[in-house]
Amino acid sequence: MGEEANDDKKPTTKFELERETELRFEVEASQSVQLELLTGMAEIFGTELTRNKKFTFDAGAKVAVFTWHGCSVQLSGRTEVAYVSKDTPMLLYLNTHTALEQMRRQAEKEEERGPRVMVVGPTDVGKSTVCRLLLNYAVRLGRRPTYVELDVGQGSVSIPGTMGALYIERPADVEEGFSIQAPLVYHFGSTTPGTNIKLYNKITSRLADVFNQRCEVNRRASVSGCVINTCGWVKGSGYQALVHAASAFEVDVVVVLDQERLYNELKRDLPHFVRTVLLPKSGGVVERSKDFRRECRDERIREYFYGFRGCFYPHAFNVKFSDVKIYKVGAPTIPDSCLPLGMSQEDNQLKLVPVTPGRDMVHHLLSVSTAEGTEENLSETSVAGFIVVTSVDLEHQVFTVLSPAPRPLPKNFLLIMDIRFMDLK
């Protein structure tokens, strides 16, 4: 490892990595870091690096560059931390991928469906990273797996507050992640499943149904299977939601990261044919503060409207109150004694409540439903996209929105989220 100064006054450090080691680094706030592979071969979360190409990582990025055979890399810019580690679970993750690939080959041979894998564990154990790794390795072998995102706090297939699925056709971009060309997305409306667990489980079942339908008509998708990312809530109703997801998707393999108790509970409660595997988390996994999570969510939403590093220009326009119908999924909890005869609190959680446009809508995100009419179940209908309310004019009965596409809105049914986005940058 050597340090040198370059012309841009950015500190430049060269690292020599031995086989099966990884360089871990975090980018300082308000800084960016460039990474270049000089010799050998290396990968980031399963995506191979191109030699002599500079990759840029922005503030807050936490990156691990792994090499199977040894390499030399160069970092330019200020890192909060940068070190090489020999202690990495990559071999175990590769073994998991190899076992899944064997299952795909068997499925191909026997005209059956491929493995459906669910990755579970508490918060901050690297679930999304393991999903990305397994998907990248599969797609590099010519597979076309489906990525299912059940983590409403992260929303890596779309934005936070949603659940969705993405057909993976190429490895994730080193800087941008997976190409989100045509995801299937459902509105949940909040960043924690606990706000409406009945709706959460219903959307999980809906996603599983749609995935099954796709597998019936697309042999390649069926053989390639799916990788399911889940929330870090693993107790009580959160645990029950995991069991429900495993059942809805008829999963074959559950990868449990870093929690033996959860591993034993799932082994006990899931059908005997489900293979449950306990894997360690990587030493590079960092605990994220609430503020950091909030910033990541904001950044995710900003990227939806403005594109990666601001490559899009969103549209602002007025929408008449009379042109749209706005709903919230789930009525407020009321005492059981006040509920209509034969109705339970659970029914209340799926109820569509009309929302009257008002100033309290400002900064709220709205999902634009693909539904043609309310006779369709809005909570189980996918969404076309999202808008954010920037102002409300009660006098003229219009509200102004930020939208990724120009007017008019494709449909007139909107679902309001609890999530707010302030466009301050």
UniProtKB/Swiss-Prot annotation:
Q: What organism does the UniProt record list as the source? A: Homo sapiens (Human)
Q: Which cofactor does it need?
A: Mg(2+); Mn(2+); Ni(2+)
Write out the GO MF terms: ATP binding; ATP-dependent polydeoxyribonucleotide 5'-hydroxyl-kinase activity; ATP-dependent polyribonucleotide 5'-hydroxyl-kinase activity; polynucleotide 5'-hydroxyl-kinase activity
| Keyword Lipid metabolism tagged | no
One GO BP: tRNA splicing, via endonucleolytic cleavage and ligation
Per the record, what are the reactions this protein catalyses?
a 5'-end dephospho-2'-deoxyribonucleoside-DNA + ATP = a 5'-end 5'-phospho-2'-deoxyribonucleoside-DNA + ADP + H(+); a 5'-end dephospho-ribonucleoside-RNA + ATP = a 5'-end 5'-phospho-ribonucleoside-RNA + ADP + H(+)
Please tell me which top-level EC class this enzyme sits in.
transferase
Query: What is the name listed in the Swiss-Prot or TrEMBL entry for this protein?
Result: Polyribonucleotide 5'-hydroxyl-kinase Clp1
Q: What SUPFAM superfamilies does the annotation carry? A: P-loop containing nucleoside triphosphate hydrolases
Q: What is the effect of changing residue 140 to H?
A: In PCH10; decreases kinase activity, impairs formation of the tRNA splicing endonuclease complex and impairs ability to mediate tRNA splicing and maturation
Name the domain of life. Answer: Eukaryota
Can you state the subunit structure given in the record? Answer: Component of the tRNA splicing endonuclease complex, composed of CLP1, TSEN2, TSEN15, TSEN34 and TSEN54. Component of pre-mRNA cleavage complex II (CF-II). Also associates with numerous components of the pre-mRNA cleavage complex I (CF-I/CFIm), including NUDT21, CPSF2, CPSF3, CPSF6 and CPSF7. Interacts with CSTF2 and SYMPK.
Question: What are the annotated disulfide bridges?
Answer: none
